[in-house]
Structures are given as structure tokens and as C-alpha cells.
Amino acid sequence: MAHVIDFKEAGFDSVLDELEWRGLISQSTDRDRLAHTLNGEPVHYYCGFDPTAPSLHIGNLVQLIIMRHLQEAGHHPIALVGGATGLIGDPRQSGERILNPKDIVEQWCERLRIQIGGILEQEGSNPVTFVSNYDWTATMNVLDFLRDIGKNFRVGTMISKDIVARRLNSEEGISFTEFSYQVLQGNDYLYLYDHYDCVLELGGSDQWGNLTSGLDLIHKVRGVNVNVMASPIITDANGKKFGKSEGNAVWLDPNMLSVYKFYQFWLNRPDVEMASLLKAFTFLPKAEIERLVEATDTNPGAREAQRVLAWEVTSLVHGDEPTRKAIDASASLFGRGGDLADIDLETLESVLDGLKVENEAGEKVFAQALPGDRIAQAGVSAGLFKSISEARKTIKSGGVYVNNVRVEDEEQLLGDGDFLKGRFVVLRRGKKALGVVARS
């Protein structure tokens, strides 16, 4: 697994200094008070994760990494999984969320707990504490909620929150359900303050309005100043919100995004993003990150920083062994590593998924073939050649490979043993052009 170190080993005077250097703080409550809080005795802090999907994504990973930094510094993490707020849904930039059934929310809550537990320490002297806001929200009746909590919220302040104001001015407006979300989140912080002496809440900067609702509530009803710390919305080299792959979120669940594709996402990041991503998504010390950034400038072709980044993040999320399999599969695909036949079917399917071709209906599918088909025809079907004559010519010149074995005869047929796991044949033209056919 990726090596996790605390701020002292990383060469910083405090964990707050390190988080700032890594670009993980965009705004916070009073900085001096926050520094005093984090530089003193260990405190409880929390971050909430709503089950709006069956998996967390790399936007959530930023929060988990911040939580792990604070945990390594000795502070006590509380991971709140939104069993109650997940039934309500926080306001989005546009459109109401679809409310999921309670049983689905419960299932997703459990899946999120497993993912969170894979990043944060669950054993030892400072394990993460898991809570669900359903436990204290479901038992509160409407009258108590309005008298004890709602009384402390001013509607004028609530409608001035950025997302709420935007939704109010839109055609679809905002429901009372989503409008009330910030009150529920504020009550969460109050509950955790009362029962765990929690004095710091974490979240993304796009949630600043919701984050400060608890801050204000605690000040009003307990007369105490607590803290909020928000991370920036990380963007890519083009200024777009980071973490989208072909329009889809980069999920942490390997059943929603394979380990191989997750690894490739990080491996394919451009040079210009290396400094910010190594700081934000790895626990590497400052000196090592600076060395990797310098290596990118002096020898970009080696892509050392990308390989280190991909290893560190993938092994952190998925573990060492699955990450090694993803790396080995990638190398085997181009004949630079082990035997393709040694790759398990799940990894093989994931590796080859990007080699699908478009059918007449515009769908991405595997090209089809059977034992006894000519390799030249298979190459055309897989999109490596425009014609059979072109395929034969390339075979004759020694430039075509089946499962990394050079094809010697332009009339050669596919054999039953050529189908890896009885399913796939990997075709290669030259050093880099790949194609695949699947048994029909």
C-alpha cells in the first residue's frame, strides 16, 4: 500500500502547514484559531459522506486524504455516513435529486463505510469512528426539530447561500426538502460537538454554505467557536472539474471502475498536473515530490512522476496486489512483461475494454471472430487494418502479432488455443497499435 507518513516525517512544522503546502485548504474559519486547535491536544474532527451513489469517487478521496493526514497527526477522525441526509439529498447546481428508497440508502451507506475504512486506520490507538446521522435524526419529532433547531436559523441567511440562491432564481426552483438540508447538516455538527467534543468539520469548498450552518448553530446554542476547513475543487489542466473520465466519475469501487482503468486514469495525467496531483493525492514527502516534478521537467519522456502517482493513488485505494496486476497487465499487452495467458479474466476484460469497435448501431462492442477465421480478417474486424490486402501485406513484413507472438503466414488461421481464457485474441500491429476480437 502507498506509504503514509505524518507531517514531521514529511518535513513540516505542523499538519496545518503541510495541508496548506499540499493545496488542500481553500478556505477556513479563523486561521489562528484553527492552528491553535490542531497544534494542541488531539481533537475530534469529522467529514460527512452522503450515499448519493453506491460508491465514493476521487472528489471524496480528497476529503479522506485530509482525514488521514489529521489522523496521522494524532487527531481523532469521525466518518459520518449520511443515513438521514442521504434520504433527503443536498441541493445540486440544477434540478432536484431523485430520492432513493430507504433500503437502497442503507446498502449504499454500508458500501461507503467499507471504502472509507480502506483509507483510514480502523485499528490501533486512534481508529476512525463511524456514525450515521440517521441514528439521531430519525428519533427527533417535527415539533422538537422546529423548536430546538429550526428556531436558530434565519431564512434570509439560508436563501443567501450560493447554491440555494442559484436554485431559487432558476426555473425549477428548490423544494423545502432540499432547502432544509443545511439545517440537518448543522444539527449533525451540534450533535457531534455535544457527544464527541468534535470541533472541526471538513468538506469541499462548494459546500461552504452547508459547512458554516453547523458553525453558526453551535455558536448560538452553546456559545462556542468551532472550526470549519474546506478543500478546493481540484481542476485539471483545462480548468475543468477534476475526476471525470469520458463524462463519468472516477469511482473508487472496482466494480464500477476497474483497478486497471483507475490506474490508467492517473498514469495518463499530463506533465503540467504533476505538482498539484502529487501534493494532493499522495503522502510522499516534500523533497520527493519536488524531485519528481524536477524529473518531469528535465526528462518528461520517462514519465516517472506519472508512474509514481498512479502507483501511490491506486495502491492507497485498491491495495498493492491489485495494483501490481494492473501494471503487469498493461506491460503484457504490449509484450513488455509476462504472458497474456496469465492475466485473470476480470483484469483481461478491463484491459481490453478500450479496444472495442463501434457497430452499426453506434454501440461500442468487441469485434467478433471464431477459430478457423483468418488472422488478416480478424485484424480488419478489430479496426487495425482498412482491408484484408493491407493486413496481409503487414503480416508478410512481420508487423502483426497474435497474443504477442509474431504471425509468420499471411494465410494463418486463428486456432482454438489463441483465445485467451477461451474468449479473447489480442492483435498488435507494430509496437503500439492494438486490437481485440472476442469469440462469437
Curated annotation (Swiss-Prot):
GO annotations of cellular component type: cytosol
UniProt cross-references to InterPro entries, sorted A to Z: aa-tRNA-synth_I_CS (IPR001412), aa-tRNA-synth_Ic (IPR002305), Rossmann-like_a/b/a_fold (IPR014729), S4_RNA-bd (IPR002942), S4_RNA-bd_sf (IPR036986), SYY-like_C (IPR054608), Tyr-tRNA-ligase (IPR002307), Tyr-tRNA-ligase_bac-type (IPR024088)
Residue ranges annotated for the S4 RNA-binding domain, each copy included: 373-430
Reactions catalysed, as given in the entry: tRNA(Tyr) + L-tyrosine + ATP = L-tyrosyl-tRNA(Tyr) + AMP + diphosphate + H(+)
Motif 'HIGH' region, residue range(s) on this chain: 51-60
Chain positions of motif 'KMSKS' region: 241-245
The keyword Cell membrane appears for this protein: no
Top EC category: ligase
Major subcellular location class: cytoplasm
Pfam families tied to this protein: SYY_C-terminal (PF22421), tRNA-synt_1b (PF00579)
Subunit structure: Homodimer.
Record-given protein name: Tyrosine--tRNA ligase
Organism encoding this protein: Bifidobacterium animalis subsp. lactis (strain AD011)
